Regions:
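Tryptophan-centric aromatic hotspots in well-structured domains and transmembrane helices
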Residues: 20-23, 32, 78, 91, ...
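Hydrophobic pocket/interface hotspot
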Residues: 19, 29, 47, 65, ...
Length: 143
């Protein structure tokens, strides 16, 4: 597997329906993910949100849902306004009864400019925090 691909798997003590809601309901997403103005798990839906780099730089994330299979798979493009590069983020859900295994894959990272904020380690750190701390804490609260 390319070192420009991030794969993180985490098992949550929550049914697949709760995990899907956390990934697709904008009000729930705001509690663990990013502050999105709107989000719909529908192919073709476009959304954007601000983010901050290591030194305070502001970035606008530009995304479009490319796959939305309820309770199974969500994928969207991930780009930055005014920067080259195109990547995809995929969330795959595996129903394990009272638990859900979630596999996150972020591909295409080598298409971004050579910059510390776009480094694979930066993305890996961000996704690891979101999956193993933010989302896990959120689901533990609501399940």
């Amino acid at each position: 597997m390319s070192n420009h691909v991030i794969v993180i798997e985490e098992t949550f003590n929550a049914p697949v329906e709760k995990v899907w809601e956390a990934l697709t309901d904008k009000d729930k997403m705001k509690q663990w993910y990013f502050n999105l103005d709107d989000f719909k798990a529908e192919k073709g839906f476009q959304f954007s949100f601000p983010g901050q780099g290591h030194k305070g730089e502001q970035y606008i994330h530009l995304c479009e849902v490319t796959i939305a299979e309820p309770l199974q798979k969500l994928q969207y493009s991930w780009q930055y306004k005014d920067y080259e590069g195109y990547s995809t983020v995929t969330f795959e859900l595996f129903d394990e009864g009272d638990q859900t295994r979630l596999k996150l894959t972020h591909e295409g990272l080598d298409s971004f400019p050579q910059h510390p904020d776009f480094a694979v380690d930066s993305f890996r750190g961000g996704w690891t925090h979101l999956m193993t701390i933010s989302l896990k804490d959120y689901l533990n609260k609501v399940s």
